[in-house]
Curated annotation (Swiss-Prot):
Protein's recorded name: Cytochrome P450 monooxygenase eupD
Source species of the chain: Phoma sp
Main enzyme class: oxidoreductase
Family matches, as Pfam families: p450
Phenotype of gene-disrupted mutants: Abolishes the production of eupenifeldin as well as of the intermediate humulenol.
The protein's annotated pathway: Secondary metabolite biosynthesis; terpenoid biosynthesis
Gene name tied to this protein: eupD
Function, as annotated: Cytochrome P450 monooxygenase; part of the gene cluster that mediates the biosynthesis of eupenifeldin, a bistropolone meroterpenoid that acts as an antitumor agent. The first step of eupenifeldin biosynthesis is the biosynthesis of 3-methylorcinaldehyde performed by the non-reducing polyketide synthase eupA. Oxidative dearomatization of 3-methylorcinaldehyde likely catalyzed by the FAD-dependent monooxygenase eupB is followed by oxidative ring expansion by the 2-oxoglutarate-dependent dioxygenase eupC to provide the first tropolone metabolite, tropolone stipitaldehyde.
Amino acid sequence: MSIAGLVTTLPWLMNMLRAVPGATGRFERFAGWCYEQLLLKRESLAVERATNHNHEPRDVMTWLINSMDEGDRCAPPTESALQEDARTLISAGSDTVAITFTNILYFLVKHPTIYQKLQRLMDHEFPQGYSSWTYNKAKGVPYIDYIIHETLRLRPAVPMGFLRQTPPQGLQIDEIFIPGDVIVNVPTYTIHRDSRYFYDAAKFIPERWEELSPDTAAYLAFQRGPFTCSGKNLATMQLRMLISCLALRYRIHFAPGEDGVAFATQEKETLTMWIPPLQMVFRPR
């Protein structure tokens, strides 16, 4: 999927590449599989409707399909747009959480005092250990969210951000004027590491979020405004569950021969962040 990182900034390039035999083979196979999943979803919805088992939609794709069928003004404008939404949902709903949790594991091993602090907090919250774990109590430990925010600040799952188009009248930002109908991008990775917005910007410091809020800081891990990530709450819930259960159950360290250097320096921009393998050992506490 490395091609996705390139064509996101040059969307017209995909049409050219598709004319070259074999140039987009892997992407086309992925797109075909996503289309099959969309067809299966439509079939299951048709069965539900035929048997009067309609219920409130529980996933984003159901909302999108229903909006198209009902002619809602917020619906994807074309079938092609719906297929693109399917590819986005499948990619964003799987890779991003796995990438982020792997990055969290790396930072926790590289900063053992932070992991020890997390374990102390979890032990205090769950004195009987993992057997007494509940999500409602785990989500009440702010330090878990600090770790999530700081990991996504330094290694956002979608480093490049997304393209936007300026309004026809243009856009004035301080002393800079951007003409209308211009494609712009705010690079998430760069903003997150800018020392104007974060002290010791290159360092992993979860405690900085005791004073900062992801809603007001220069923090774009989930984008902002009406285009914010629709899976933000689900992803946050999954990461809270993984981090809290990890801290209660395991001691972690790099596997023999692993130092994390390649993992930290050889990531690639492929729309979502591509990360090398990270060899680790998990030992029960």
